[in-house]
């Protein structure tokens, strides 16, 4: 059991509203969150399966023997698919798994994922994280009460080099900029640790999406 309340503040729905962030109800727009996660996971895939065709097999282009007079079947090249060691016909080739995720879907999914973590009481606020030297031990002291058995995501406004290097040796801990965090990042970790300056960035990202959404809706009704 985590005992984070002594050193960190639990972010509740009411406190999120104090920052100007209104969280959606549970069950609303779950399909949007699903679509975004499928897109993020698909974009992380790389098609690596590949077979060599007769054009890519390393072999001589010389005709194995003359066309007539040998009594054997005619052959033009040793990389022919009918020969052992030749190319493969219609074999698997690398494919592009990437999906285009609309900006609106990204914004809604981020809001949904953040709301889910807040309602589950898995988001904690802490003061600005600063490191004057690279020390893993000091990084752990900032997260005092976190036993490390459950994965944790530290969201910072502008993580310094010392912070990144101090945290990369800690198992199950991820560090990401508030400007770059997405729904997959939030749901991929059990606990979320939010630096207070990062909350403002996160709220501004959501507000920006809401402004664009309202402008599009108003423009569409004219």
From Swiss-Prot:
One GO molecular-function entry: rRNA binding
Coiled coil: none
Gene3D superfamilies xrefs: 3.40.1370.10
Keyword Ribonucleoprotein: yes
Keywords from the named record: Ribonucleoprotein, Ribosomal protein, RNA-binding, rRNA-binding
UniProt-listed Pfam families: Ribosomal_L4 (PF00573)
GO term, biological process aspect, one: translation
GO CC terms, sorted: ribonucleoprotein complex; ribosome
Oligomeric form and interacting partners: Part of the 50S ribosomal subunit.
Family: Belongs to the universal ribosomal protein uL4 family.
Entries under NCBIfam families matching the protein: rplD_bact
Annotated function: One of the primary rRNA binding proteins, this protein initially binds near the 5'-end of the 23S rRNA. It is important during the early stages of 50S assembly. It makes multiple contacts with different domains of the 23S rRNA in the assembled 50S subunit and ribosome.
HAMAP family in alphabetical order: Ribosomal_uL4_B
UniProt name for this protein: Large ribosomal subunit protein uL4
Gene name as annotated: rplD
